[in-house]
Amino acid sequence: MKSILENRPELAYEVNQAAEVAGYLWQKGWAERNGGNITLNITEYVDDEIRALPAISEVKQIGKVLPYLKACYFYCKGTQMRMRDLARWPMANGSIIRILDDCASYVIIADQPVMPTSELPSHLAVHNYLLEKGSPYRASLHTHPIELIAMTHNKKFLEKDVAKIGRASCRER
C-alpha cells in the first residue's frame, strides 16, 4: 500500500517537520518514552483524492462539538508510540484523521489505523480555538520532560519555597 505522502511534497514536508520535532524532543530528553502528543492541522494540503479516501477505522467520538474543525484533517501521533520512532517512521507511528461533518467525531483515513493518543480531544479543542481566532498556528504539542517528572518525585522539590521559585520562573505566569 502506498503512503498518502507519496507524490504530495508539501504534505510530506509538513509531516516530516513534525517528525523532526519529535526527534528533537527525544534527543534532548524532553519526551518521556511515549509521553506527549503532536497534532498538526494539514487541511491546506488536502486534495480531492485525499477527501475521497475511505475511513480505515470506526467513527470515533471527540466528546465535544468543535464547529471550526468541520472538514479539517490532522496528522496525529499514535497512542503508545514513542517520539524516537515517530521521528524515523511518522506514518507508522501516527495517522491522518478527518473530522466529520457533525464536528464531534473523526475517522482515520491514512496510512494505517494507528489510534491517536487520549489527549487528542484536548489538542483538537486547541485547534478549534486557533481557527476561531484566525490564528496562523497549525500545530499543538505537549510532552512530559523526563527531568521535570523526576523533580516532581523528589520531596525537596515539593517544598513550598522551591516550588514557588519553580513557578516564578515560568514565563506563562
Model-derived segments and spans:
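Glycine-rich flexible loops
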Residues: 1-173
